[in-house]
C-alpha cells in the first residue's frame, strides 16, 4: 500500500518519493506500447511489410476503443484523485464504478456497430485488395475482445490512483511479457501470421485485465466496486473531464488515415509501411512525456483535492525542469539512433528503411515541443478543467495537424508529411504556455 505518496505539505516533497509514482507510470506506458511494437517487429520479420501496413490501416479502429477507455480512465481517475485528496472515498468509489461500467458498455456497443459494417469501414480506411484479408484477421480479435481491451485500460489508471502505481506497472509488465512470448509461439513457431499477432496481443490484455479484477476484489486502498448511488451524470462528468484523451485517440485515428493516404500517394505501399514504423517508434518517445505527466498528475490531484495549492506549485516546478531538459535529450537520441530503431522493422538499404530513417528525423522535431503541450493538457484535466485540456489536445492532435497534413505535402511532398507534426506542436505551444502562465486554479 502506497498511501504515503499523498503529500500533506511542501516539506514532505522529495524527488525520490515522487519518482515512486513517476517511474512506474512511465514503465506502465512503455509496456502498454509493447503490445503494439512487438506485434510490428514479429509481423515485419515473419510475415512482411504488407502485413505491417495492414495493421496500420486498421489501427484507427483500435484508437477508437482506446479513446473510449481513456476518456473515462483519465477523466474518471482524475476526479477520483480529487475526491481521495478531499477525504471523500465513497464518492471516489462511485466515480470509479460508474466510469468502469459506462466505458465497458459503450466500448462493446461501438465494437458491435463496427463489426456490422466492417468491410465497408476498412475500405474507407484505405485497405486495398492486397491488404483487406490481413486487416480483417487482425482487427477481429480487438473488436470481439472490446470489453477486455477497455477494462484493462481502466484498471491501469484506477489502480494507480488507488495508491498502487507499482501494481499498475506489474499488470502492464505481465501483459507485455505474455504478449512477447505468445508472439514468438504463434508467429515464429506456429506461423499463424497476423492472426497470431492479434491473438497474442489479446492474451496479454486479458492477463492484465484479470490482474486488475483480482486487485480490486482482494486488496484495494481507497476504491472499491459499488452500485449504490451511481448516476449517468457522474459518468458524463468523467467522460467530459477526459475529453482530451478521447480527442487525442480519435484524432490519431483520423490523422492516421490521412497519413496513410498521403504516403500512399507519394510513395505507394512502402510509404504506408514507413509511416507504420515511425508511428511505432514515436510511441516510445511520447510515452516518456505521457508517463511523466500522468505519474505527476496523481499526487497533483491529491493535493488539489485537499486544496493544498503550495504543494501543487512545487510539483509543477519539477515538471518545468523536466520539460526544459528532456526534449533536447530525446530529439538528439532520436536523430542519432533512428537507423537502429528502424532496423527492427525493415532491412537496411531497403526503400522502406531509408524512407523511415529520414522521416523519423524530421517527424522527431516535434518531440522538442510536444512534451510541454502534453503536460499542459494533463495538468488542466487533473484540476478538473477537461474542456481546456481538450482544447490543447484538439489543436495539437487534430485541427493543426490535419491542416498541415493537407498543406505541407503540396509544397514539400513526402517531407511535408513528416514535418506536419512539428509544425502543429509549435503552434500549440503558444496556447499551452498561456495556460501554464495561469496560477493554480483555486
Where are these regions (language model features)?
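Small-residue-rich hydrophobic transmembrane alpha-helices
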Residues: 52-112, 149-168, 274-338, 370-389
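Hydrophobic transmembrane alpha-helices of multi-pass small-molecule transporters
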Residues: 64-67, 179-183, 208-213, 283-287, ...
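N-terminal transmembrane alpha-helices
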Residues: 9-47, 60-75, 79, 104-111, ...
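Helix-terminus/linker motif at the lipid-water interface of multi-pass membrane proteins
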Residues: 34-53, 122-129, 185-192, 253-284, ...
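Short alpha-helical transmembrane segments in multi-pass integral membrane proteins
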Residues: 1-22, 80-147, 189-243, 300-366, ...
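Transmembrane helical elements of multi-pass membrane transporters/channels
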Residues: 20-39, 141, 175, 204-208, ...
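Interfacial/gating helices of multi-pass transporter permease domains
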Residues: 43-63, 129-134, 194-195, 234-241, ...
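Short runs within selected transmembrane alpha-helices of multi-pass transporters and secretion channels
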Residues: 73, 142-160, 168-176, 197-210, ...
